[in-house]
From Swiss-Prot:
Organism of this sequence: Cytophaga hutchinsonii (strain ATCC 33406 / DSM 1761 / CIP 103989 / NBRC 15051 / NCIMB 9469 / D465)
GO molecular function terms attached to this record: rRNA binding; structural constituent of ribosome
Known function: Binds to the 23S rRNA.
Family designation: Belongs to the bacterial ribosomal protein bL9 family.
Pfam families referenced in this protein's UniProt entry, alphabetically: Ribosomal_L9_C, Ribosomal_L9_N
Gene from which this protein is expressed: rplI
GO CC annotation terms, alphabetical: ribonucleoprotein complex; ribosome
Biological process (GO), any one: translation
Record keywords, A-Z: Ribonucleoprotein, Ribosomal protein, RNA-binding, rRNA-binding
Name of the protein this chain belongs to: Large ribosomal subunit protein bL9
Keyword rRNA-binding: yes
Amino acid sequence: MEVILKEDIKGLGYKNDLVQVKAGYGNNFLIPRGYAINATVSAKKVVAENIKQAAHKAEKLKKDAVATSEKIAGLALEIAAKVGDTGKIFGAVTSLQISDALAKKGISVDRKKIAFKGDVKDAGEHTALIDLHKEVKVELKFTVVAE
């Protein structure tokens, strides 16, 4: 019996895979629990269309990430912070501050996607790595200046 998996099943296959199983396993376990559907002609067409739409959506997300990375690459960002006599800032520059500064420039980036190479606790130039997509990462150079 052929079934189409609705989710990943260890040892059997991944979501939307067409797999051959014994009739008892398919009818008594996989289908009643919602792990799979019977592989009819119409179900195969629906799954093929879903896969096509998912691929199109993933491609669009990647294109958007590339466009955003091009905007960020040529950007000069300044972050204002209170600085003491020794040049150290009070506290540290956070990903939220970087995200807010990018938003003021018209670029929306989730703060969770911004990572620093160490703590940013002094004035001067620094870099942050922004993970826009699993295949698109961009390095942002920013300057911390005294308020």
